[in-house]
């Protein structure tokens, strides 16, 4: 199938459905996922659609991305995430005061952290428990607990984080885009991330390369503001 025809068919699907997944395109057109992602990247760069994690949305659609649960995320790209997490953990020094964002890749970091003298602040209940059980000094941010991501959010969390000055911060993201920045589906999580980033001296985004050129609903940082740790 010619590239132009293929891309027009993708745009036609978007016109009808407003949003479309890579799987839906694959089933409809009978082409590979890698080809689909390349087409979506091209069409996004041309301003004909917005590429998001797992698919695309129409330019004029009211998009609100659905957040995957922690258990679902754990099954996605584990090998790549662990490689990123191991490299990130090696950057922690004994005197560091660390902010550890909620997320599967930041969670994998805990398996590789060697510096027991570092102090950790996190808004992730699972991270706090794992750190404490492993003998680390950890502070769990208080606030409203979000069920799907098991992250603490809300005004109490934001006010708590504003009291700290972190030497380093390690963050997760749902989307990475030069044009749209770093994005996440949930406005409350975006506010917590944005607040924590302001309190960090050095900040890192941990992301597998599949999230590149993807866009979620809410931007929490501009591209170029943060060091990116990835698998490629």
Which sequence ranges carry the predicted segments?
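Conserved phosphate- and dinucleotide-binding cores of soluble alpha/beta proteins
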Residues: 2-5, 11-12, 21-22, 51, ...
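HTH-adjacent hinge/linker in prokaryotic transcriptional regulators
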Residues: 2-5, 9, 15-23, 28, ...
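Short glycine-rich, flexible loops that bind phosphorylated cofactors or substrates
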Residues: 44, 107, 178-179
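Glycine-rich N-terminal segment of FAD-binding domains in flavoprotein oxidoreductases
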Residues: 103
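A residue-level structural signature of the nucleotidyltransferase/glycosyltransferase Rossmann-like core
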Residues: 119-120, 168
């Amino acid at each position: 199938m010619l590239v132009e025809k293929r891309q027009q068919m993708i745009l036609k699907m978007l016109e009808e459905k407003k949003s479309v997944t890579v799987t839906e395109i694959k089933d409809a057109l009978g082409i590979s996922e890698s080809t689909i992602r390349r087409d979506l990247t091209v069409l996004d760069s041309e301003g004909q659609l917005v590429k998001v994690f797992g698919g695309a949305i129409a330019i004029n659609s009211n998009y609100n991305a659905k957040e995957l649960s922690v258990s679902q995320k754990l099954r996605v790209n584990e090998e790549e995430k662990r490689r990123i997490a191991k490299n990130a953990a090696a950057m922690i020094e004994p005197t560091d005061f660390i902010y550890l964002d909620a997320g599967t890749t930041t969670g994998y970091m805990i398996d590789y952290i060697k510096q027991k003298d570092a102090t950790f602040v996190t808004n992730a209940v699972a991270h706090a428990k794992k750190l404490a059980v492993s003998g680390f000094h950890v502070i769990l941010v208080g606030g409203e607990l979000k069920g799907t991501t098991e992250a603490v959010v809300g005004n109490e969390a934001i006010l708590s984080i504003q009291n700290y000055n972190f030497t380093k911060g390690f963050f997760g993201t749902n989307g990475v885009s030069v044009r749209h920045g770093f994005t996440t589906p949930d406005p409350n999580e975006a506010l917590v991330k944005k607040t924590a980033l302001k309190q960090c001296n050095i900040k890192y985004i941990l992301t597998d390369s599949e999230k590149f050129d993807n866009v979620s609903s809410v931007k929490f940082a501009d591209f170029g503001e943060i060091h990116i740790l990835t698998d490629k």
